[in-house]
């Protein structure tokens, strides 16, 4: 059996992913990195991008959209604290664009300041998803 690393991803939206993987490819503020088993410890800021995980050495890479966050690499563990993540095959760009248009329309018609802030936050999240999606 191949030597594997535990990947843990956590977001403020209570999204969690925990699985054993062979490699994780990430885009940090310093450039792209690939984390393999027994990688030296490191901590870095990650940017909005499409990351890739490989479950086994010869397995195909699986694309995963990650938004801003921090990665901590330890001997047998990669921990990612990200604003948002989703596997690329689960993302429906048409639905995101439709939702974005609806949110912008709702914002233009909203008078309550608290609801405006919530709408702006959702708009920013969806715009970030679209930008990161183009990174693939």
UniProtKB/Swiss-Prot annotation:
A Gene Ontology cellular-component term: proton-transporting ATP synthase complex
Q: Which CDD domains did the record assign? A: F1-ATPase_delta
- Pfam families linked to this entry: ATP-synt_DE_N
What are the record keywords, sorted?
ATP synthesis, Cell membrane, CF(1), Hydrogen ion transport, Ion transport, Membrane, Transport
Q: How does this protein lie in the membrane? A: Peripheral membrane protein
SUPFAM superfamilies tied to this protein: Epsilon subunit of F1F0-ATP synthase N-terminal domain
The primary site where this protein sits is membrane
Q: Which residues form a coiled coil?
A: none
Listed GO molecular functions?
A: ATP binding; proton-transporting ATP synthase activity, rotational mechanism
- Chain ranges passing through the membrane: none
Query: Which family is this sequence assigned to?
Result: Belongs to the ATPase epsilon chain family.
Q: What does this protein do?
A: Produces ATP from ADP in the presence of a proton gradient across the membrane.
Q: What is this protein called?
A: ATP synthase epsilon chain
């Amino acid at each position: 059996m191949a030597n594997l690393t535990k990947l843990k991803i956590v977001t403020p939206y209570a999204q969690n992913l925990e699985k054993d993987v062979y490699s994780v490819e990430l885009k940090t503020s310093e450039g792209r990195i690939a984390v393999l088993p027994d990688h030296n410890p490191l901590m870095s800021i990650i940017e909005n991008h499409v990351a890739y995980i490989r479950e086994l050495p010869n397995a195909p890479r699986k694309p995963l959209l990650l938004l801003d966050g921090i990665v901590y690499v330890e001997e047998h563990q990669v921990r990612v604290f990200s604003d948002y993540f989703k596997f690329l095959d689960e993302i429906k760009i048409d639905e995101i664009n439709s939702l974005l248009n609806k949110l912008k329309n709702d914002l233009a018609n909203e008078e309550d300041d608290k609801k405006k802030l919530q709408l702006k936050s959702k708009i920013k999240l969806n715009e970030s998803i679209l930008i990161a999606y183009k990174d693939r």
